[in-house]
Amino acid sequence: MYYDIIESPIGPILLAGNEKGLKHLDFLKGKKRIEIPADWIENKKFFREAARQLEAYFSGKLESFDLKLAPEGTDFQKSVWKALCEIPYGETRTYKEIAVSIGKPRAYRAVGLANNRNPIAIIIPCHRVIGSDGKLTGYASGLDIKEFLLKLEENNLR
């Protein structure tokens, strides 16, 4: 597995993946200790395109990513993550709307859990999912980051 740490407006981001594609995008802000597995190899060149696209996203010049992704999860989780990728830039959906879109209308809590376990934040846009009351709800990396990403997209649509 290869990795790189890139800087962003919301702090350092860890990218990890292999020839199959990007497997992880994790926010490192606020983490006191970063444990990178001993068998991972730092490789900036491998993540050059991902870093370029993320920089364009944060600059408001990119609305959708074109990267090879290889998230690991259950079939259900992968169906949720695929549905998240269909939420247009600058828009939001509720957990229930995602559940309906994947043909499991009563599984909105399971959708929330799959959303929380998304290993490739931003690129699989779990930040675009909100509560049925329109409020920001749980985000594994913190509501401040979720709010930042939603405002970034909203401001770039104007």
Swiss-Prot record:
Gene3D superfamilies: Methylated DNA-protein cysteine methyltransferase domain, Winged helix-like DNA-binding domain superfamily/Winged helix DNA-binding domain
CDD domains associated with the record: ATase
Keyword Repeat: no
List of catalytic residues: C126 (nucleophile)
UniProt GO cellular component terms: cytoplasm
EC number(s) reported in the record: 2.1.1.63
InterPro entries: MethylDNA_cys_MeTrfase_AS (IPR001497), MethylDNA_cys_MeTrfase_DNA-bd (IPR014048), MethylDNA_cys_MeTrfase_DNAb (IPR036217), MethylG_MeTrfase_N (IPR008332), MGMT (IPR023546), MGMT_N_sf (IPR036631), WH-like_DNA-bd_sf (IPR036388)
Its biological purpose: Involved in the cellular defense against the biological effects of O6-methylguanine (O6-MeG) and O4-methylthymine (O4-MeT) in DNA. Repairs the methylated nucleobase in DNA by stoichiometrically transferring the methyl group to a cysteine residue in the enzyme. This is a suicide reaction: the enzyme is irreversibly inactivated.
Family: Belongs to the MGMT family.
Protein name: Methylated-DNA--protein-cysteine methyltransferase
Protein source organism: Methanosarcina barkeri (strain Fusaro / DSM 804)
Gene name of the encoded protein: ogt
